[in-house]
Amino acid sequence: MLRIVMDGAGDILPEWSAEYGIDVIPVNILFGEKSYLQGVEIDNEGFYKMVDEYRKVPKTSQPSPHQFVEFYRKIAQKGDTILSIHITAKLSGTYASAIAAAQEVKDEFNVIPIDSALGSLGIGLLCREARKLERAGKSIDEIVRYIENVKYRARTTLTLDTLEYARMSGRVKTLQAALASALNIKPIAVLRDGDLNMTERVRTRKAALSRVIEIPKEEFKDAPVVLAALHARDPKSGEALLEEAKKHFNYKEAMMSDLAIAVAANLGPGTVGLIVYPLE
């Protein structure tokens, strides 16, 4: 049997877990001396409450190889194949943990760790498509080839409402964050080839949201795509972004999701983004 596993730095729509048989191994969220399993011991709202209360951004850590081994044994039976699809290895050690765990359980399961080169709902979309291909009769090799082909063509573009959370998490320097706040500058970040880079800075939120659409539009033009809006505690902006994006793309499906805690911890509330996922 084919099992599909992703980590908590990815997102799926609530119904996908049961509909497509996707299992999620939690990320560890560290507040001070306490550790919480994302989605098990702390949800998104609980996370933001703690951030508001303590004015500190928690640290996040990938599942350990031991946690992976325990998780694989929990969700699979001897002889199963496990596609283990994870957040870009350039931003996290999760993929490395999965590789180590795969070696440990190689006599029990055929684990295939995959670096998605993506995050958030990009990982979820890969997992969903993998299950669809399996149900269509495709082999494991064909499914892996599909993932390896599409993962570098999907694009994620984000705008941060503030650099304060990135500063607290150590992603940007204090001076940069202070200057951006004073000038009301909104940074634009693009996830490309597994790397997340700040590519532009604009002066208003409205201009930033426009660029989140314009940047991938320049690349995809009229190609058929899936659109996925992302937001961190700002569903209104996420919905507005998605509705505007629909006017500019040849989309076949559109959806919206909260940003995973593991991602939101580094980017902060008010972050809004768009994933453009190619269909050909």
Where are these regions (language model features)?
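Glycine-rich phosphate- or other oxyanion-binding loops that anchor nucleotides, phosphorylated ligands
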Residues: 53-56, 62-89, 96, 100, ...
